[in-house]
């Protein structure tokens, strides 16, 4: 019995050392000019059909935006965000060529889903429209969104 206990202590120690570190928060509170704030996701890398590009989700109390270095194509109306296994939420509009906007009910739905979710699958389409390269997706972590949202609500009024 005694030798069995001494064998388990080193085994348990090695097991604890090999445990994965906690995942870091993927969201940052950013103060913007004019006194407002927004939440910025970590940037995700995807292809635009021709080259690698980045996409980032930005959230304010009234809007959810996806920004990219590449030019978006909304001609088919299929730009969307799907949180976990929820139904995908379609974008409302583009703001310029490089920003996809979700506002009103779409933004409210996404913000509620971001608080409860683990990941967001962002589906995008890029210009040029010919030859068409289809949609391209990037998965963004929602770890830390709720904590960042609460911080924004408390400190950015």
Where do the model's predicted regions map?
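Bacterial N-terminal signal peptides that target proteins for export
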Residues: 1-9
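Hydrophobic h-region of N-terminal signal peptides that target proteins for export
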Residues: 10-20
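A generic "folded-domain core" signal
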Residues: 19-157
